[in-house]
């Protein structure tokens, strides 16, 4: 990603285990969802991110971005921290996720024809956050499936330049 006005570093956290069909990685078991494992991984990620200040990395200048299960993790973890921005692509709310009025700004994107994670999941996140948070929350719906919308990435780049 090329962003002209912002000086930044990328930290990419890798999910701890392989997806069962070897197409990627996962934070917790999916089939069926292992919510206890999800809660554990959320807590582990929170512990890790809270240590960023020891490396002179400000949470207020941190962006959490995730796709699918990673989008779910970004939403759950990000809403518990005072971070700069959450970006969720084709994500969904975790079973125990409860947003509050302190949720940071959130950008959500979801394909209208997604058969893996229904768009209703992102609509649910959007509606919950809009009902209680003063920060902005955007839901980008696009003609597509379980994928990342290239046009949305351009929008994210503009938002990053605006916010940071």
Q: Which functions belong to the PLM regions below?
A:
Residues 56-66:
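Alpha/beta-hydrolase fold nucleophile elbow
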Residues 1-57:
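Serine-hydrolase catalytic machinery in alpha/beta-hydrolase-like enzymes
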Residues 76-80:
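Active-site signature of alpha/beta-hydrolase-fold catalytic machinery across serine-
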């Amino acid at each position: 990603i090329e962003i002209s006005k912002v000086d930044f570093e990328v930290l990419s956290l890798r999910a701890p285990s392989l997806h069962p069909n070897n197409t990627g990685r996962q934070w917790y078991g999916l089939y069926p969802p292992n919510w206890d494992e999800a809660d554990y991984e959320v807590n582990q990620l929170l512990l890790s991110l809270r240590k960023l200040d020891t490396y002179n990395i400000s949470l207020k200048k941190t962006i959490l971005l995730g796709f699918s299960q990673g989008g779910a993790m970004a939403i759950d973890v990000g809403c518990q921290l005072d971070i700069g921005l959450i970006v969720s692509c084709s994500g969904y709310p975790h079973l125990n996720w409860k947003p509050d009025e302190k949720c940071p700004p959130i950008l959500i994107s979801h394909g209208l024809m997604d058969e893996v994670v229904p768009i209703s999941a992102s609509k649910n996140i959007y509606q919950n956050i809009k009902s209680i948070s003063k920060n902005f929350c955007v839901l980008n719906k696009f003609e597509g499936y379980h994928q990342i919308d290239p046009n949305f990435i351009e929008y994210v780049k503009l938002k990053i330049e605006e916010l940071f």
